[in-house]
Amino acid sequence: MSGATLLKESGPREVFCGLTSIVWLHRRMPDAFFLVVGSRTCAHLIQSAAGVMIFAEPRFGTAILEERDLAGLADAHDELNRVVKNLLARRPEIKTLFLVGSCPSEVIKIDLSRVAENLNIELKGQVTVLNYSGSGIETTFTQGEDGALKALIPLMPKSDQKKLLLVGTLANAVEDRLTSIFNRLGIDKVESFPPRQSTELPSIGPETKVLLTQPYLTDTARELKNKGAEIIEAPFPLGVTGSTLWIQAAADSFGIEKSLVDSILNPLISRAKQALIPHVEKLSGKKLFLLPESQLEIPLARFLSNECGMEIIEIGTPYLNRDLMKAEIDLLPPDCRIVEGQHVERQLDRVRDSSPDLVVCGMGLANPLEAEGISTKWSIEMVFSPIHGIDQASDLAELFSRPLRRHDILNPKTLTSN
């Protein structure tokens, strides 16, 4: 492991809860529906984050817990059964229903696993009902996807077929490009999890080699390993270097000659490095502070430091899985400081003391920091943007160069001179 300093911190946090992951999961699996069992606050969060008006009938919704439910004056389990049956009668196209726990449902101890089990018995296979927690008590932001995928794993059929399984939600176009690269390398059987239809789950077995596309899938990786799959150790496919090493790790696992890998990737690498140049010119030498939210912070810091020349002040991450992150940490500059967890007040003090050029943070902290004259980039944009793979390296860099260009245009000196 590199000489990076690993620290832990606890205290008040400023992060999204795991419900937010519904925003990209419901787009990935259009035959699934995500029913949050929560409050009106939960409903407003999901609707606002998704940017979808509720009358458009999106593939998510909230079963609102009223005061009667919270006070124990109504049987919340019976009420939830009624809501689910009404939903399925109105939306017969639903094939998989996720019951998603929230802070209120966790506090009053609604047993969503029992509700799901009873509904599966009643529905007799017409719809598969699953449950997981998106509660802010238990999860942060991207961990919602980890919970959803873990819930699907018991349904995956067994197979002894040799295959590569890409695990973690990707933009469809990015997934297609990466699959094409693996096919050209001679890996014919490439599948993705989650699939594009919730009912078309990939099979899994001892000949399944898992390549994680996202760093926040700790529970999913553990469950897949328990099913006999092999987890390929690699950095994550962000930037030219990370994506190249990620693809090379898969090729090595399948015994593919490096010369073939180089012949296919070198033209892509050359184009990507050329496209990075204008962004590197803007980012090089700038100081970066990453506050914890998405668990993408370490791979992002590696890319921005090694390929864009940024100076990393601190890398905050909500949780640190040292096994999944080992390849990433090994690539970091030796003087990096990684802080797992968060005490938001102390962290903000360190931000102000270090005078960064750019802070990567959650939406709740961005406006206050901008008001203090500190340029910010929302963490949530990394999850919603197609940033994976060699081809996307310049798009990823642009997400960080853009706020610096905006700051140059809007800084007080510019405004005064004009």
Curated annotation (Swiss-Prot):
Positions contributing to [4Fe-4S] cluster binding: 17, 42, 103
Pfam families per record: Oxidored_nitro
UniProt-listed GO biological process terms: light-independent chlorophyll biosynthetic process; photosynthesis, dark reaction
GO molecular function (one): metal ion binding
Disulfide bond sites: none
Origin: domain of life: Bacteria
InterPro entries: LIPOR_BchN/ChlN, Nase/OxRdtase_comp1, Protochl_reductN
Cofactor or coenzyme needed: [4Fe-4S] cluster
Gene3D superfamilies in the cross-refs: Nitrogenase molybdenum iron protein domain
Family annotation (SUPFAM superfamilies): Helical backbone' metal receptor
Cofactor mode of binding and number, as noted: Binds 1 [4Fe-4S] cluster per heterodimer. The cluster is bound at the heterodimer interface by residues from both subunits.
Annotated pathway: Porphyrin-containing compound metabolism; chlorophyll biosynthesis (light-independent)
Catalytic activity: chlorophyllide a + oxidized 2[4Fe-4S]-[ferredoxin] + 2 ADP + 2 phosphate = protochlorophyllide a + reduced 2[4Fe-4S]-[ferredoxin] + 2 ATP + 2 H2O
Keyword line: 4Fe-4S, ATP-binding, Chlorophyll biosynthesis, Iron, Iron-sulfur, Metal-binding, Nucleotide-binding, Oxidoreductase, Photosynthesis
Enzyme Commission designation: 1.3.7.7
Function statement: Component of the dark-operative protochlorophyllide reductase (DPOR) that uses Mg-ATP and reduced ferredoxin to reduce ring D of protochlorophyllide (Pchlide) to form chlorophyllide a (Chlide). This reaction is light-independent. The NB-protein (ChlN-ChlB) is the catalytic component of the complex.
Subunit structure: Protochlorophyllide reductase is composed of three subunits; ChlL, ChlN and ChlB. Forms a heterotetramer of two ChlB and two ChlN subunits.
NCBIfam families, alphabetized: DPOR_bchN (TIGR01279), PRK02842.1 (NF002768)
Family: Belongs to the BchN/ChlN family.
Protein name: Light-independent protochlorophyllide reductase subunit N
Species annotation: Prochlorococcus marinus (strain NATL2A)
